[in-house]
């Protein structure tokens, strides 16, 4: 009789949570330096944050949210809010790119940091739990493997 092999590897939610931790550390570092930053540095931080947030949002949108076919109304509402926040982050970043004074850029970056924190908190407190209720561990591991391949990392 063939032995049943248990699937290994991190699930998508665990990988996204790890990314949350890294992004939050980056935000804390930016926040500490925020008062002393000039316009060029503020825009540079915005550009770096844009790359990280865009990559993160793509994985959430294409792997996590897209895997939730026929979601119940409560989950649909949460997903719409998440998509809306992704759009708001993009708008803030666009405004930051065109800011001409450091005070305005600082205010935009500060608001972006707050929005990212709020967004992650809702995902962690509500959305990820709803996803776990509706998605098997095997499916989450498969999505985790797809995420890892797309990012060029090994999950085990």
Predicted features along the sequence, with ranges:
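Small-residue-biased structural context
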Residues: 1-156
């Amino acid at each position: 009789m063939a032995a049943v092999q248990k699937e290994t590897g991190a699930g998508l939610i665990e990988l996204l949570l790890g990314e949350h931790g890294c992004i939050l550390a980056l935000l804390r570092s930016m926040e500490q330096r925020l008062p002393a930053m000039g316009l060029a540095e503020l825009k540079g931080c915005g550009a770096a944050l844009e790359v990280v947030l865009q990559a993160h949002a793509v994985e959430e949108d294409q792997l996590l949210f897209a895997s939730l076919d026929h979601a119940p109304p409560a989950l649909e509402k949460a997903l719409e809010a998440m998509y809306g926040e992704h759009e708001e982050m993009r708008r803030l970043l666009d405004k930051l790119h065109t800011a001409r004074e450091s005070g305005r850029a600082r205010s935009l970056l500060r608001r972006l940091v707050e929005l990212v924190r709020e967004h992650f908190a809702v995902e962690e407190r509500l959305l990820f739990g709803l996803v776990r209720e509706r998605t098997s561990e095997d499916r989450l591991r498969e999505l985790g493997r797809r995420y890892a391949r797309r990012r060029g990392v090994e999950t085990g």
